[in-house]
Amino acid sequence: MGRLGPSNGLLPLLLAVGGFSLVQAQRECSCSAVSPGILAGIVLGDLVLTLLIALAVYSLGRLVPRTRGAVDVTRKQHIAETESAYQELQGQRSDVYSDLNTQRQYYK
C-alpha cells in the first residue's frame, strides 16, 4: 500500500495561502514529525476517553432519583382528593349577569 500523507497539491496550496512555502515551513520548524501510529493513538485515546465520560454521565444520571416528578404526582393526587377542579352548577342565577345589562346601555 501507499504511504499515508497529505496530497501533493493540498499542502503547498494551504502553505501558500498562509504565506509560507513548503521549504520555509520545514526549515523554520524545529519540531519532530508525528508518525501515523502516534496520531492514530491520540485519536483512539480521545475516542475512548469521550466514551468513558459519556458512560459515566449516563450512569450517574440514572442513579439520581427523580424527586420533582414524584412530588408533582402526589401533589396532584392530594388536590384531587380534597377538592374538585370544577365548580358545581347551581342553577340559573340572574344576579351574576345583571350588571352586564346595565353597562351595555352606556356603550350604545
UniProtKB/Swiss-Prot annotation:
Signal peptide limits: 1-25
Post-translational modification as stated in the protein's UniProt record: Following ligand binding by associated receptors, tyrosine phosphorylated in the ITAM domain which leads to activation of additional tyrosine kinases and subsequent cell activation.
Keywords: Calcium, Cell membrane, Disulfide bond, Immunity, Membrane, Metal-binding, Phosphoprotein, Signal, Transmembrane, Transmembrane helix
GO BP: actin cytoskeleton organization; amyloid-beta clearance; apoptotic cell clearance; cellular response to amyloid-beta; forebrain development; integrin-mediated signaling pathway; microglial cell activation involved in immune response; natural killer cell mediated immunity
Topological category with respect to the lipid bilayer: Single-pass type I membrane protein
Molecular-function GO term, any one: signaling receptor binding
Cytoplasmic-facing ranges: 58-108
Record note on quaternary structure: Homodimer; disulfide-linked. Homotrimer; disulfide-linked. Homotetramer; disulfide-linked. Homotrimers and homotetramers form when low levels of partner receptors are available and is competitive with assembly with interacting receptors. They may represent alternative oligomerization states or may be intermediates in the receptor assembly process. Binding of a metal cation aids in homooligomerization through coordination of the metal ion by the subunits of the oligomer. Interacts with TREM1. Interacts with TREM2. Interacts with CLECSF5. Interacts with CD300LB and CD300C2.
Protein name: TYRO protein tyrosine kinase-binding protein
Species this chain originates from: Sus scrofa (Pig)
Gene: TYROBP
